[in-house]
């Protein structure tokens, strides 16, 4: 449970102050200002404990949002609420700034009254909130009985994330599979650690109350304790994509996802995150980095780095950037690269190599001679890892959308009447190779 919520500007002045529990006093406001906002050293942790009081905080631009409690609460739940609160405020009045918060403080207090009940998060869906809290934060006094019953059913009913009566001239559905691949590889090419964090984001512009079914490739198996799913797939001889953990939007019917291996749901209107997942097995590594560092005496280094793309030749990777670290006593660098542009950045102690596009099953290399200043420091250079950024048009986990179906019996439009788009985007997370 959350004891209170404070919103500060960059100076530490309180813009919004709402307390839900008697054990949170006004001194908590000053404690956060002094120990976090005005701290001599930057506070890196998002959770700060001061005098048996926990402060969970996020920062948007120059605005601080702090949830405070003296209870032992689920930190993930508190941060989920804080980020949802930011999204709701942005949906109502745009950019979260001091001016916008001051101009809409009445609206923010109304939103807090609806979102939190005695410190417990209740309803944070923007679509549901907008039905009974207007843009100006003034509740309409001219609602018919039918409109009032619609609001009541949406807030208290089973489908609180979608209002009735939505109509579009053209029914469209956009599905994005967004993945971030993280890697740590040894100089010899051995994978030390690798995992993929993924999200399925949907934009729904559908009329009525549609039923959607989303199916992933047959080989996918969600590993669960007490269920022999991995054994079953190995017996059948099929390779499996094992998802280590997975969370769904509240609109998903979990009972059907377990039994049918498909995700059934009535989607919210507009953009939302359908699911989030993580996998550590059978990852397709888009790039292999092969480093070679040779010390020529005490004042010279020779570096050669080869990158190989490991995907279909018909696909193109974009926004490729390789960062090759250099010693602190570097005096000059001469670079030769086969493709793209490379530049030594003294302020970052790194050679930055950029390539706009690169097709699959190709390789490219860069060579550099690094001149070093003489130093009395006997400690050897630690050789930080080479890092890489990129974007590829496929999912490194191997996840694929098998089907996406829409049914709306009341308005009598079928799956064939819906325009559907599916897109895969794989990006680098922390993608490093030791050298």
Swiss-Prot record:
> Phosphothreonine-modified residues are where?
156
Protein's cellular compartments? Cell membrane; Membrane, Coated pit
Main function: Component of the adaptor protein complex 2 (AP-2). Adaptor protein complexes function in protein transport via transport vesicles in different membrane traffic pathways. Adaptor protein complexes are vesicle coat components and appear to be involved in cargo selection and vesicle formation. AP-2 is involved in clathrin-dependent endocytosis in which cargo proteins are incorporated into vesicles surrounded by clathrin (clathrin-coated vesicles, CCVs) which are destined for fusion with the early endosome.
**PANTHER family per the UniProt record, alphabetical:** AP COMPLEX SUBUNIT MU
Q: How is it modified after translation?
A: Phosphorylation at Thr-156 increases the affinity of the AP-2 complex for cargo membrane proteins during the initial stages of endocytosis.
Q: How does the annotation summarize its subunit structure?
A: Adaptor protein complex 2 (AP-2) is a heterotetramer composed of two large adaptins (alpha-type subunit AP2A1 or AP2A2 and beta-type subunit AP2B1), a medium adaptin (mu-type subunit AP2M1) and a small adaptin (sigma-type subunit AP2S1). Interacts with ATP6V1H and MEGF10. Interacts with EGFR. Interacts with PIP5K1C; tyrosine phosphorylation of PIP5K1C weakens the interaction. Interacts with KIAA0319; required for clathrin-mediated endocytosis of KIAA0319. Interacts with DVL2 (via DEP domain). Interacts with KCNQ1; mediates estrogen-induced internalization via clathrin-coated vesicles.
Could you name the Gene Ontology cellular component terms for this entry?
clathrin adaptor complex; clathrin-coated pit; plasma membrane
Checking PROSITE patterns in the record gives:
CLAT_ADAPTOR_M_1, CLAT_ADAPTOR_M_2, MHD
Q: Positions modified as Phosphoserine?
A: 45
Q: Which residues bind a 1,2-diacyl-sn-glycero-3-phospho-(1D-myo-inositol-3,4,5-trisphosphate)?
A: 341, 345, 354
Boundaries of each MHD domain copy?
A: 170-434
Q: Which GO MF terms are attached to this record?
A: lipid binding
What is the name listed in the Swiss-Prot or TrEMBL entry for this protein? AP-2 complex subunit mu
What does the similarity note say?
Belongs to the adaptor complexes medium subunit family.
Pfam families in the cross-refs: Adap_comp_sub, Clat_adaptor_s
InterPro entries cross-referenced by the UniProt entry:
Adaptor_comp_med_subunit (IPR050431), AP2_Mu_C_sf (IPR036168), AP2_Mu_N (IPR043532), AP_mu_sigma_su (IPR022775), Clathrin_mu (IPR001392), Clathrin_mu_CS (IPR018240), Longin-like_dom_sf (IPR011012), MHD (IPR028565)
Which CDD domains does this one have? AP-2_Mu2_Cterm, AP2_Mu_N
Record's superkingdom? Eukaryota
**GO BP term (any one):** endocytosis
Note the topology in the membrane: Peripheral membrane protein
The yes or no answer to whether the keyword Translocase is present is no
- Keywords noted in UniProt: Cell membrane, Coated pit, Endocytosis, Lipid-binding, Membrane, Phosphoprotein, Protein transport, Transport
